Amino acid sequence: MYEIKLKNLTKSFGSLNAVDDITFTIPKSSVTVLLGPSGCGKTTLMRMIAGLETPTTGSIFFDDTEVTRVPTKRRNLGMVFQYPVIYRGTSVRRNLELPLLTEKLPSEEINKRVNDVAELLGISGDLNKMVEELDNGTRQKIAVGRAVARQPQIILFDEPITNIDITAKLELKRSLKEVFSRLSQTIIYVTHDQTEAMTLADQIALMKDGVITQCAPPKEIYEKPKSQFAGWFLGNPGINFVEKEHIGQSGTGITSSLFTQSIEAGSKAVKVKALGVRAEAIEVKTKQVPDSQTAHVLRKSLGIGGQYLLDLEYGSLKVKARVPHQLGREIGKKVWTTIKSSDIILFDENGVAI
């Protein structure tokens, strides 16, 4: 399968650089998710890899072969779009067969591929049904099956589960996770949904304003965001930011009203703009203990899937904490917090992690 290498890739529309000088490698047989808000350039980047857009400058390589201006049909890739491409008035089996018939494969090979893909996607029982009988989630599985059955080197997914209902979305996400674990193709998946990215990716390329701000495995990019943007965009809720008005700095030591210990910034020259801490990293106690901070006021408690999301207030400082059980504390009463130094991330004046 192909390794994909992008070198100084730029796509301009007038004065706007939708993709701005990206150099980036996608390992072969990996699942790479291009994640970011609407308008960040992720779909434009995918379309250039597919050959549907021509770069303004820069190069694209599949392994060591440059394909920057090679037509899409010669790139040996499959695509699954937001709106499934299916043939109405035909059966599921026929929809899966058609791309293979154009390649003039033997009928035995076509039947084998169709049956294998249907089993992989859990739609074997639907093969003889007309596509009009199926829900949107199953129709999107057909679109996935059509791309997989061709056995291309690369498969591109452009927000494939955005326009289906929540139940079908969860089922399709589970199916895609299973499919991806069993495929050897290089997969590129575009989404604005962080939950999809965290569930499906081997690596996430987080995009903003046409550039990749961080590329790392999901766990790393969540626990060690390299920017305030990454900390805010990944997580529900996003990371708590304590801005400089709540931070004290003396030499390399950093203190805050959120915690008792002093954190080392590493250099006196570094000016700390903000610090970040995840909601689940804040331990909340109903009684004060020696290592806990001055009392916060509990303002809200919301049960979510067996956990509780708390809104805490310390003067003008407001943070969210996630705890595994109900506190048994009335709203408006005091609670105390503890945070490990290793869970605190410092950000400089440019919003970059120190």
How would you describe each model-predicted region?
Residues 35-37:
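The feature captures the beta-strand-to-loop junction immediately N-terminal to the Walker
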Residues 56-59, 209:
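Conserved coupling/switch loops of ABC nucleotide-binding domains, chiefly the family-specific signature
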Residues 237, 249-354:
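Non-catalytic connector elements of ABC transporters
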Residues 76, 82, 86-229:
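ABC ATPase nucleotide-binding domains
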Residues 58-66:
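Conserved ABC transporter NBD signature motif
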Residues 50:
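Helix-to-loop junction immediately C-terminal to a conserved catalytic motif
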